[in-house]
C-alpha cells in the first residue's frame, strides 16, 4: 500500500504542480479573461492539458460528464423548483467543500431530497441548506475516519427511508439500530438544546451535524483541500470534472476554469 502511494505521489505531483503553468500559458494569466475567451479551440486546449498532465488518467470518466451533468441539473430543478439556483450554487462549491464534482454532489443530493423536502413541508430553501450541510458532513466524516464515502452516502440514503442499520458506518459511537439513532438524537439535544424527531429526516441530518461539530469533525474536507496533497488533489480532480462537464453542455466555463486553476 505504502509503495503504491509513493509511486502515485511521484507520478502525480509533478503533473499537478505543472498543470497551473500549462493552463495559464495556454489561456493567459487572467483566468477570468481566459474564461471570457473560451471557445471550442481553447476548451480543446485545456482538455489536452489535463490529459497531458496525467490528470486525465484519473478523471477519464469526466469526458462523459456533460450528459450526466444535464440530467442532474434537471433533477435539481424538478425537486427544488424556485430554489434550484440555490442548490446549484452549493453544487458549484462542492469541489472544495465536499471534495466532489458538482454532478456527483447533485446526484447524491437528489437521492434523498424528496424525503428531506417532505420533512420540511415543502420548504425547498431550508431543504437546500440542510442538504448542503449533510453533504459536507458526509465528506468530513469520510476524510476524518478514512471510511469509504459510498458507505456513508448509503447510510444517509437509508436514513431517508427510516433504515438505521448503517448508522455505525459513520463511526460516531452509535450502532446500526433505531434505538441507537434515538440515542444520537438525545445526545444532540443535550448539546444544542433543540429537540429532534426521529421521524423527521431534516431533524436526523441536523442532529448528526451537531454530533460531528462536537467531535471536531466539521470542516475536515475544506481544511484538507487547503493543506494536504490528497485533499488538494481531490479538489483539483473534482474541479477538472466540473470544467469538462460545463464545456460539454456550454455551461459556466469561466467559473469552472478559474476553480481549476486555483486548485492546480
Predicted segments, located by residue:
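Small-residue helix-packing and pore-constriction motifs in hydrophobic alpha-helices
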Residues: 48-98, 110-118, 130-142, 151-197, ...
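Short N-terminal signal/transit or membrane-insertion segments
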Residues: 29, 121-122
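Low-complexity, glycine/alanine-rich, low-charge segments that are largely flexible
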Residues: 1-67, 163, 249-252
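Tryptophan-paired
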Residues: 107
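Short, conserved charged micro-motifs
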Residues: 18-22, 85-87, 124-126
Amino acid at each position: 500500500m505504502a509503495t503504491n502511494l509513493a509511486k502515485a505521489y511521484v507520478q502525480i505531483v509533478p503533473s499537478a504542480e505543472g498543470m497551473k503553468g500549462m493552463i495559464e500559458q495556454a489561456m493567459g494569466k487572467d483566468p477570468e479573461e481566459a474564461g471570457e475567451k473560451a471557445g471550442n479551440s481553447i476548451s480543446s486546449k485545456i482538455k489536452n492539458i489535463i490529459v497531458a498532465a496525467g490528470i486525465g488518467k484519473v478523471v477519464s470518466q469526466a469526458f462523459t460528464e456533460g450528459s450526466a451533468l444535464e440530467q442532474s441539473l434537471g433533477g435539481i430543478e424538478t425537486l427544488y423548483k424556485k430554489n434550484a439556483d440555490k442548490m446549484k450554487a452549493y453544487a458549484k462549491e462542492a469541489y472544495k467543500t465536499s471534495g466532489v464534482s458538482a454532478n456527483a454532489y447533485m446526484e447524491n443530493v437528489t437521492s434523498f431530497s424528496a424525503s428531506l423536502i417532505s420533512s420540511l413541508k415543502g420548504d425547498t430553501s431550508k431543504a437546500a441548506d440542510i442538504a448542503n450541510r449533510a453533504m459536507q458532513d458526509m465528506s468530513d466524516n469520510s476524510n476524518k475516519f478514512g471510511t469509504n464515502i459510498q458507505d456513508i452516502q448509503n447510510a444517509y440514503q437509508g436514513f431517508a427511508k427510516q433504515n438505521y442499520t448503517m448508522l455505525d458506518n459513520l463511526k460516531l459511537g452509535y450502532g446500526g439500530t433505531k434505538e441507537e439513532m434515538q440515542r444520537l438524537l438525545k445526545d444532540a439535544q443535550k448539546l444544542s438544546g433543540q429537540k429532534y424527531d426521529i421521524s423527521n429526516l431534516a431533524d436526523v441530518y441536523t442532529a448528526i451535524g451537531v454530533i460531528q461539530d462536537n467531535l471536531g469533525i466539521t470542516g475536515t474536507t475544506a481544511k484538507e483541500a487547503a493543506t494536504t496533497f490528497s485533499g488538494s488533489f481531490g479538489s483539483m480532480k473534482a474541479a477538472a470534472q466540473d470544467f469538462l462537464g460545463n464545456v460539454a453542455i456550454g455551461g459556466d466555463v469561466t467559473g469552472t476554469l478559474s476553480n481549476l486553476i486555483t486548485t492546480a
